[in-house]
Structures are given as C-alpha cells and as structure tokens.
Curated annotation (Swiss-Prot):
The lineage of its organism: Eukaryota, Metazoa, Chordata, Craniata, Vertebrata. Residues 5-27, 107-177 form a coiled coil. The keyword Cytoplasm applies. This is Serum response factor-binding protein 1. The keyword DNA-binding does not apply. Residues 128-435, 453-535 are annotated as: Disordered. It comes from the Eukaryota. One of its GO terms (cellular component) is perinuclear region of cytoplasm. InterPro entries: Bud22/SRFB1 (IPR037393), Bud22_dom (IPR015158). Pfam families: BUD22. It is found in: Cytoplasm, Perinuclear region. Keywords: Coiled coil, Cytoplasm, Transcription, Transcription regulation. Its main location: cytoplasm.
Length: 535
C-alpha cells in the first residue's frame, strides 16, 4: 500500500509555481507585443500586427485575473493542448490564457507527476479490493477444514477414555487373581496386598498421560479372560474392613519420635550462650581513645600564636611616636617601646640624614625660587595625576618617592632636627644667584649616598631641587611680586612636612588618594648618578 495521496495539498503546493509561470508568460507577451508594433510594411500587415497585439494584451489581462487553484484543477481534469485551443475561431482570451499556463514546461512536468501518482493510487486501491474479495472466498473453506479436524480429535479422546477404563478393569482383575493365589499363604500378606493394589488405580487416575501407552497394549492380549474374575469380585470386600486398623498405628509412631529429636536441639544453644569473653575484650579497647584525648592539648598550645597581633602592634606604635616628636623631640620613648630592631633602623636613618645634609649643601648653588613658585602653582595637578607628562620623567620619579614620606618615620624626625636658620640662608643665597640663571651649564656629579644601597633613603631635599630644575621648561614669567612672598613661605613649609600638617590638615579624600598612589608607587629606588643642571 502506497501512502495516502491528498490532492488538495498538492494543489496548494502548486500555487507558487503557477504564480511564477504567470509572470514569465506576461513578460513574454509584452516583448511579443513590442515586436509586433515595431514591425513595418504595408498597411494591411501593420493592421494585422495591431490586431494580434490587441489579442495578446487581452490575454495578459485574463492571465492576471486567473486564480492559481483553477488553473491546476483544470489542468488535472483535462489534457489541454495550446495549438487546438488557438485554432478554434470562437476561443476566448481566458481559454487561451489558461492553455498557455497549463502547457508551460515548468507547470506541465509537475501536473504530469501528480496524474501518475493518482493512477498509481487508484491501482493500489483496486488490487487491495480484489485481494479482500479473494480472502472472503477462502475463509469459509478454512472454517470447514477446522470443523473436520475437530471431529478426529474428539474421536481420539473417546478412544483414550475407553482404553483407560479397560486398563482399570484389567488391573482389578489382576488384583483378584493375586488374592486368590495368595489366600493359602496367610492373612497378613493378604492384608498388605490389597493396600498396595488399591493405590495403583489412584496413581493411574492422577497421572493419566504416563500409563496410556503402556496400559493400552496389555489389555489387547488379555481381553478374553473377562469371565473368570466375574465370580471372584466379592472377595475384595473382606479386606476393605481391616485396612483402617493397619493404618492407625502407622500414623502414631512418627508422632512419638519427633519430639524426642527436638529436645536435644534445645540444649545445645543453652551451652553456647554464656560467651563472656567478648565484652571482656571490648572494655580495654575503650582505654586507648582515652589516651588519645590528651593529644588535643597540642593544637590548644598552637592556637594562641600571638605573632600576628605582635607584628601589627609596632605598626600602630610608629604613628604614636611621630606625634610627640613634632612637639618635643624626646628620644627616650622609642627605646622603651620598640625592640632592638628599631634602634638599628634609627641609626641607619641618622646616617642617611647626614649624607642628605651634605648633598643639600652642595645643591644650594642650584636652588631657584622662581621655579619653586611655578612648582607650587602646579603642585595640585601633579598630586592628582598618577604620572606627569611624558617629558617629566624625573618629576614623576621624585613624586613617587615623596609620597612614601608618610610611611618613613625616621625621615620626618631628621627634617625636624634641621634648623630653620640653614633654610633661610639657602633661600637668600638662591635669590642672589637668580640673575646668573642665563648662563646654563650641564654637569654630571657622582654622589656616594646614591650609589650606596640604603634600606630607607630619604630624597626630601633633592626632590625640591629636581622639580625646580625640570619645571624651568614650562614658561610662566608673569608672576606678580605679591604672590612670591606667600610662595616663599610655602617653600619653607615643604621642607618640614611635619609643620605643614600641623598648619593645614589635608582633606580625607586627598589622604586616601595619596595612600593609594603610595601603594602603587612602591617600586625599586633609582640608584645611580644624579644629573645636575648648572645655572
């Protein structure tokens, strides 16, 4: 059986193809009309071409109006040929348009395929109907055959029942014969025989299938001996009275023996129960975990490791040392609170301070107050930005080191110890040297303090000079003389950051940004030659 063909679905699928064919035919007809109109010749030919063009135009309008479903249905019903339709004198524009669409090669192939599928579908249905009719004719014959087969089966069953009956009778006859032969031997044997012989027919009745083949053969030979046991059957009734007397004692004997076997079975588990050794072994096993429990004391000793808070406390003590140093530089407190490590750090810092003071004395010649003024005008912009312009390499480097001043406790103490008289002398010397700034010279000076590896070097004095030298490049000559005086006071305050903090505390947001930048700028210090620009 082929799959069920739904014609409506096929018609719907062909709608797109019909629309395509419509477009193609309209284009073809328009081209044909243009050619007919462009042709030249006699007046009769021109009129004839005009009439043909008019007919083609009518066909185009009718093609547009036709529905795709109507085209496919008519093409499936009839065998349309365009030549026959055109030869008809009475053919309308619609008929010609429909013939054009149906005979188009794109549509014609699909319509022929559908027609073939319809034929195959019909043929399959016809063959299926014929096959069903043949089956209906064959069914009554099968029923009759079944009925005929049932009859011999019933005959066989009847024969089997008759054979079973005859076998039972034959067994009874044999019993009677045996009873008569053994009557002389004794009453005891006579009682046992019927008991055994009567059980045989019961077994044969239960297992009908087993004795069928064996018992059917025996009576076929011994059938003529039916008359003899007919007289001796009443002899079977006598032992039937004595059978229950034999059976009763046989049932009582095993009933007495069973409880005798069960009693010793109860005594044995009574001996096995007093197993007192197991709990005795388990009790000392409890003592071992008791020994393991005091081992918990070790983690208890390890937990109070107060090393972490011990590291944090000296970090808190350092800022506490800084505040009293600003008021009065008392050196008695740090040795009491701090361990010997702090003493070594202070000694190193003092050594650094001496070297820095020597460097500052050498650099007094290059101090320029005008550059310092410019530096202070742009100090806010330098502090906000992470790094200065691309040209200001040293400024960025010095600014990062300057930001570390808050962490360095020793550096603040040294700066406070430096007397303000020296700073005033430096500023006066620098002001004298301002007119000689035109003659600029470059020198390379080697500093021992820079070449040495120090744990915490302080570049406070050098920072100001570096920034001043680098800040000479940006041109800011228009600085009012009134603005110079407060800037000079600022310059003195830069050298002593402790005093500046007392005068003007920073905004918390500035402090936070400064701390963040200090963390970012924790890089290795510049260790090498210091470049100095001579005026």
């Amino acid at each position: 059986m082929e799959p069920v063909l739904n014609l409506n679905n096929e018609v719907v699928k062909l709608r797109k193809d019909v629309k395509k064919v419509k477009v193609l035919i309209i284009r073809k007809l328009t081209r044909h009309i243009a050619k007919l109109k462009s042709k030249k010749g006699t007046e009769e030919l021109i009129l004839k071409n005009q009439r043909r063009a008019q007919r083609l135009l009518e066909e185009i309008h009718s093609v547009k109006e036709l529905k795709p479903d109507d085209v496919t249905k008519t093409a499936l019903r009839k065998e349309i040929s365009f030549e026959k339709v055109c030869k008809k004198p009475n053919s309308t524009a619609e008929e010609r348009a429909l013939a054009r669409l149906a005979t188009h090669p794109l549509l014609k192939q699909k319509i022929t395929a559908i027609k073939e599928a319809i034929k195959a579908f019909k043929d399959a249905r016809k063959t299926a109907a014929e096959g069903e009719r043949e089956r209906e004719k064959d069914e009554p014959e099968q029923v009759t055959k079944i009925k005929e087969t049932k009859k011999p089966v019933q005959a066989k069953l009847n024969k089997n029942t008759e054979e079973i009956k005859s076998a039972k009778e034959h067994v009874k006859e044999e019993k009677c014969k045996n009873l008569l032969e053994d009557s002389d031997k004794g009453t005891e044997k006579a009682l046992e025989l019927p008991y055994v012989q009567e059980n045989l027919p019961e077994q044969t009745a239960e297992n009908k299938e087993q004795p069928k083949a064996q018992d059917v053969e025996r009576p076929a030979v011994e059938r003529p001996a039916v008359e003899r046991p007919a007289v001796e059957r009443p002899a079977v009734e006598r032992p039937a009275v004595e059978r229950p007397a034999v059976e009763r004692p046989a049932v009582e004997r095993p009933a007495v023996e069973r409880p005798a076997v069960e009693r010793p079975a109860v005594e044995r588990p009574a001996v096995e129960r007093p197993a007192v050794e197991r709990p005795a072994v388990e009790r000392p096993a409890v003592e071992r975990p008791a020994v393991e429990r005091p081992a918990v004391e070790r983690p208890a000793v390890e937990r109070p490791a107060v090393e972490r808070p011990a590291v944090e406390r000296p970090a808190v003590e350092r800022p506490a040392v800084e505040r009293p140093v600003v008021e009065s530089p008392a050196v008695e407190r740090p040795p009491v609170e701090s361990p010997p490590k702090k003493k070594a750090c202070l000694e190193q810092e003092l050594g650094c301070e001496l070297s820095d003071i020597e460097d500052s004395d050498k650099e007094k010649e290059y101090f320029d107050d005008s550059t310092e003024e410019r530096f202070y005008k742009h100090s806010s912009s330098f502090e906000d930005s992470d790094s200065g312009s691309d040209n200001d390499f040293f400024i960025g480097k010095i600014r990062r080191t300057k930001k570390k001043k808050s962490d360095k406790d020793g550096s603040k103490q040294k700066e406070e110890k430096v007397p303000p008289t020296k700073e005033k002398a430096q500023t006066s010397e620098v002001q004298k040297e301002i007119p000689t700034a035109k003659s600029m010279k470059l020198k390379s000076v080697f500093c021992k303090s820079l070449s040495q590896t120090k744990p915490k070097p302080s570049f406070t004095k050098r920072e100001t000079n570096f920034r001043q030298e680098r800040n000479k490049r940006p041109v800011m000559p228009q600085a009012s003389p009134l603005a110079k005086k407060p800037l000079q006071s600022k310059a003195t305050s830069v050298r002593q950051p402790g005093r500046k903090l007392e005068a003007q505390p920073l905004h918390p947001s500035w402090e936070a940004s400064r701390k963040r930048k200090e963390q970012q700028a924790q890089i290795t210090k510049f260790q090498g030659k210091k470049i100095v620009f001579d005026d």
